[in-house]
Amino acid sequence: MFRINNNDFKILQKYKSFLMNLDNSLENIPRKDIYLKDRIKNISLDVLKDILLCSYDTSSVKMYGTSIKANIALLDFMLERLLLKKYISEKNLYKLANELVEINKMVTGWLNNSESKFVWFTSYIWDWSKEKC
């Protein structure tokens, strides 16, 4: 099992920073919408878990990457709901959304990079097997 060093893993660092900002933003949600607050926290922790799983199991990057991107889109929608209910300011939403966009771009690049390595590896095996015959 291969593990990426967490200090060198920029996506993880960026996402941890996003989580800290998100926690500060969720403090203003009233008790009547505790479900929304808990759901946002759970989804954001699922993204963190998937990022960590990708760093430990690089063979499943595509599967976890798809989950990360879907959960980021869901977080974006839920943050918009917070703005509509006036629990966060437009400035705060803009800051959080920009961080999510940057994280999403990093994940997309990571997925594209891992796919190109997989294509290279499978074509290398295919070429090697042709030479043996």
Regions found by a protein language model. Give the residues of each.
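Amphipathic alpha-helical assembly/interaction segments
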Residues: 1-133
